[in-house]
From Swiss-Prot:
Stretches the record annotates as Disordered: 1-20, 61-85
Protein name: Coiled-coil-helix-coiled-coil-helix domain-containing protein 7
InterPro entries membership: COX23 (IPR051040), Cys_alpha_HP_mot_SF (IPR009069)
Annotated organism of origin: Bos taurus
Domain CHCH: 13-55
Record's keyword annotation contains Mitochondrion: yes
Family note: Belongs to the CHCHD7 family.
Any GO BP annotation: mitochondrial respiratory chain complex assembly
Lineage: Eukaryota, Metazoa, Chordata, Craniata, Vertebrata
Amino acid sequence: MPMVTRRLRDPDVNPCLSESDASTRCMAENNYDKESCSSHFLKYKNCRKFWNSVMIQRRQNGVKPPMPTAAERDEILGGLGKMPY
């Protein structure tokens, strides 16, 4: 597996791994009909938007690393009480 692919499959690097997998699985199950999977695409897009805003805020506050680890993301989502996307 190429290095870039391995990085994207790493839960510490990609916060929207489950949403990405769900949209890919939906496309495969629905014979690549994009309209059938639009809800999955929207959830993935909102996930990326949410974690990007978290990353920008952490950069502005000087927090390293800018992207929270998988454990930190679980704490953030737990503190919110529900999925923000």
